[in-house]
Amino acid sequence: AFIGHPTVMENPLRNGEDLLAIKRLPEDHPWITEQVEHLKKMTELFSDKVMCFYNIFSPVQWIRIRLEFFDLDFERFVYLAENYPKELQHAGKELGKDIQTLVRKLLTETKLDGIYYCVQNVQSPKYDQKTYKEIVGEDELAVLKLANELSPYNILHICGYAHHKNNLDFYKDYEAGAYNWAVHTEGVS
């Protein structure tokens, strides 16, 4: 129920216009409030036994997840990123606002210890470190910064899903309590 952001799931995601249609939700939208309520219940059950973390995808990853996991279209995210970078940046900013709201509520209203924050390079040669930082990184960092203000226990996960390699240097300024990456995919242990 929570894996898809509503304005991403209800969107054809075919062009820049579709990316511009992605808008933030009201703070009392069920996509936010129901996650908080669910995590309140879960952390009540387990937080006295183990540390509790919640998987949070970085802003534009919600778009990639929709396209790859739901549509099974493994090329369209890169197509959109290459052909509509400013529109993707807009979508990331809008999604980032909701993710910040969600993270703030989760880390202040539940017994979560931190978030497990998932990032991944845009798998395109057009997205060098400078472009990534400008189009994607600013909004990723805003979420992580907020999480770090609320908890010292956040985990940065550099996702190697489907054996997509990442330039780990892109994340050298991403401060977290712990780091996780795909050891075999990245070839770094």
Regions found by a protein language model. Give the residues of each.
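Active-site loop segments of alpha/beta catalytic cores
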Residues: 5, 27-189
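A contiguous, low-structure linker/loop signature
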Residues: 1-24
